[in-house]
Amino acid sequence: DEQQVKTVFEEVNPSVVIHCGAMSKPDECELDQPAALLNNVRGTELMLKYASVNQPHFIYLSTDFVFDGTKAMHKEEEEPLPVNFYGHTKLLGEKAVQQYAATWAVVRTVLVYGNPLGGRDNILTLTRKKLENKELFKVVNDQQRTPTFIEDLSAGIIAIVQRRATGIYHLCGKEMMTPFDMAFATAKYLQLDVSLLEKVTNNSFKEIAKRPLLSGFNISKAEKE
């Protein structure tokens, strides 16, 4: 809602904007592409439009899904190539942010996990729920990524705010893991029954949107700065 966006910027007059809102479920984006464009691209453009009045530092949260999954440890300067519509819309959002007249930063991250604080479930919370209910949990074991602990991501964003850092930044963990690896580690830590975890391949699920099989970022730029 453009009027709502306009009103918020006029009333709050922020010095920093952290734009993390998105339609972020790949299958939903694939099924309803107009809605994905409206939320992920048009929504971003509207925020940039009204931010440009007083020009706060603009931070945009993006994703490893802007890459095609043929290699890992991507650096910020590498050319994106999304393989699904969600990644496509996030890349369009990135490009819009890069045209912003004031200072901006794009923060790409990977498979965020931790306490959802009322948000949607992640691999850790799903593992706990399934295994505490004694349910079999089928978890993909042929997608490799560098998962991101939510508190590490938050600390990275705070550093960008404090330093008013600009440009593209990759913020994620250092260790390559599959979703199954994460679920197994969670179950072991919580002393839950790991025998309820079943390794499956990406093709086991009838997912509409293609997922990158190999992902993850080189975070040396963020570490240095």
Where would I find each of the regions flagged by the language model?
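A short helix->loop->beta-strand "cap" motif at the edges of active sites that frequently abuts
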Residues: 53-57
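SDR active-site strand-loop-helix element
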Residues: 17-21, 58-63, 68, 107-109
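C-terminal amphipathic/interface module of NAD(P)-dependent oxidoreductases
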Residues: 210-225
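Catalytic helix-loop patch of NAD(P)-dependent Rossmann-fold dehydrogenases
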Residues: 31, 38, 42-46, 66-107, ...
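NAD(P)H-binding glycine-rich loop region in Rossmannoid oxidoreductase-like domains
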Residues: 2-39
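Hydrophobic "lid"/C-terminal helical patch
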Residues: 9, 127, 157-161, 183-186, ...
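Mid/C-terminal beta-alpha module of Rossmann-like enzyme folds, strongest
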Residues: 156, 163-209, 213-214
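NAD(P)-dependent short-chain dehydrogenase/reductase
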Residues: 95-145, 152, 158
